[in-house]
């Protein structure tokens, strides 16, 4: 079992880091008391093989040995990896000023700057055990997310799930579409008697559409658009991208385009799905 423990000073980005890990398929628990960690792992081990927890300063043992003892109580099948997030004091003060949130140690009537310094002292129990220390002082939310993914997955690029979906405008635009392309201006096989009962998956329709230069150009332009902006979308903390291509009824032109372009991208991207909405009815 993979067990990720996320901790660090308040305001350093623990919540962002936990959301990233959750998007990677981990079962996540926020702000769990450390002494409950072994029990949690045992109770969910039958259903989950990837767990992540966040720990803040209020849920820590008082000394290093106590923390080590708790980790020793973990079952042998759990392999913990500890991420420690931190920022410099001035950055943390600025972030708290911007969000107007109360620091967890301010309940002791400590001024913010002293609460931040005291928190650092209390968290020393974790720093010495950290497998990865991430300084978020100069990182944006997206950069922190990318750093977490890179460390966990062992590679920089997140594998986006790309769906190419055909549809008919007369049945409505797909609600989950990120980009919509209108193919209704292209030559329509519907008006060819021998092609009318077929779909864009049938070879005669493919041959008919591929023979028109305007179809070839439109196909190329959609491919180029997606290929150009895909790296930026992958870095933007996305999990899914849906490219919807529509024609009048969702039978010929849009089906041909979604299938052709989807197959092209599937040759170089591992997570490509092709869906023909109207053909599923």
UniProtKB/Swiss-Prot annotation:
Name of the featured protein: Nucleotide-binding protein PSHAa2554
Protein role: Displays ATPase and GTPase activities.
UniProt keywords, alphabetically: ATP-binding, GTP-binding, Nucleotide-binding
Domain of life, per lineage: Bacteria
Positions bound to ATP: 8-15
Alphabetical list of HAMAP family matching this protein: RapZ_like (MF_00636)
Coiled coil: none
NCBIfam families per UniProt: PRK05416.1 (NF003828)
Family statement drawn from the similarity comment of this UniProt entry: Belongs to the RapZ-like family.
GO molecular function annotation: ATP binding; GTP binding
UniProt keyword GTP-binding, yes or no: yes
Binding site for GTP: 56-59
InterPro entries hit by this protein: P-loop_NTPase, RapZ-like, RapZ-like_N, RapZ_C
């Amino acid at each position: 079992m993979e067990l990720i423990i996320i901790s660090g000073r308040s305001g350093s980005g623990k919540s962002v880091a936990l959301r990233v890990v959750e998007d990677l398929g981990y079962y996540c628990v926020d702000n769990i008391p450390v002494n409950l960690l072994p029990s949690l792992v045992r109770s969910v081990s039958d259903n989950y093989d990837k767990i992540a927890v966040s720990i803040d300063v209020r849920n820590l043992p008082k000394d290093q040995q106590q923390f080590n003892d708790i980790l020793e109580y973990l079952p042998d099948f759990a392999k913990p990896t500890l991420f420690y997030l931190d920022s410099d004091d001035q950055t943390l003060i600025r972030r708290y000023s911007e969000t107007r949130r109360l620091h967890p140690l301010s309940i002791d009537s400590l001024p913010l700057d002293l609460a931040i310094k005291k928190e650092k002292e209390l968290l020393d129990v974790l720093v010495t055990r950290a497998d990865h220390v991430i300084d978020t002082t100069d990182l944006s939310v997206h950069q922190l997310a990318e750093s977490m993914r890179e460390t966990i997955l062992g590679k920089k690029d997140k594998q986006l799930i790309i769906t190419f979906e055909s549809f008919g405008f007369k049945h409505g635009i797909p609600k989950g579409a990120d980009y919509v392309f209108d193919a209704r201006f292209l030559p329509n096989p519907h008006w060819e008697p021998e092609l009318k009962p077929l779909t864009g998956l049938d070879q005669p329709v493919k041959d008919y559409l591929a023979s028109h230069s305007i179809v070839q150009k439109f196909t190329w332009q959609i491919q180029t658009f997606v290929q150009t902006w895909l790296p930026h979308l992958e870095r933007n903390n996305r999990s899914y991208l849906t490219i919807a291509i529509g024609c009048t009824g969702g039978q010929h032109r849009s089906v041909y385009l979604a299938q052709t372009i989807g197959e092209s991208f599937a040759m170089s991207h591992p997570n490509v799905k092709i869906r023909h909405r109207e053909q599923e009815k």
